[in-house]
């Protein structure tokens, strides 16, 4: 399965702000070229209503054991331009746990995406995990682009391109969290346009010597 270009490694939970903006600008430039190329395609009939785009991206991570760590990052950005609107986003969640008792460590991570009103959706998703006698880890990451070309729609409905890596692989992991129980989560959402919406929700919970949990969502509409 080919890996999409310039995806960020899940090892870095928080990237520098200018990196995010540069990625957003590159995808905007791609959308402008793409929208111009398809300008002469099939159009809606005159008088038909135009609906905007809305996208929700998020995920969660949980770890159980004496020492646990969960991290989450959600980013969602939207812009309404002349002739098209575009939304880009990602979600990266990781969990790791360690226990002195064999089989006492568990870890899970997952991501999700829901998009409405887009003509084209490109989504890349990957999940992995490891399980050893005294430790466990899991990671899940998702990247996507959603594009709506105003006054045009694909004849057969939205075009969705999904790129996936194989599912979880459980094997001795070697991942060891720091002593203690930690939970870190960040969510960012931003939208630009005449009628727009952006919102985020985050939760983080730790229980000493037992558990760590994070979840987050980012919502944008244009």
Each model region followed by its residue ranges:
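Low-complexity repeat regions of mature extracellularly deployed or surface/particle-associated proteins
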Residues: 2-222
């Amino acid at each position: 399965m080919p890996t999409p270009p310039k995806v960020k490694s899940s090892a870095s939970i928080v990237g520098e702000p200018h990196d995010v903006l540069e990625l957003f600008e590159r995808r905007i430039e791609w959308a402008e070229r793409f929208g111009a190329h398809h300008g002469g395609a099939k159009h809606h009939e005159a008088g038909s209503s135009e609906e905007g785009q809305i996208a929700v991206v998020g995920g969660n991570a949980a770890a159980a054991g004496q020492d646990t760590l969960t991290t989450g990052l959600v980013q969602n950005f939207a812009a309404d331009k002349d002739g098209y609107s575009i939304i880009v986003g990602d979600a990266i969640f990781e969990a790791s746990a360690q226990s002195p008792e064999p089989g006492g460590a568990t870890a899970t991570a997952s991501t999700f995406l829901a998009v409405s009103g887009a003509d084209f959706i490109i989504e890349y998703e990957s999940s992995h995990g490891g399980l050893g006698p005294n430790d466990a880890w899991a990671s899940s990451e998702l990247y996507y682009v959603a594009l709506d070309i105003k006054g045009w729609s694909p004849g057969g409905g939205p075009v969705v391109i999904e790129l996936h890596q194989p599912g979880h692989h459980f094997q001795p992991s070697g991942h060891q969290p720091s002593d203690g129980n930690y939970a870190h989560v960040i969510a960012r959402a931003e939208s630009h346009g005449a009628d727009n919406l952006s919102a985020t929700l985050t939760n983080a919970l730790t229980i000493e010597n037992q558990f760590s949990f994070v979840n987050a969502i980012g919502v944008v509409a244009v």
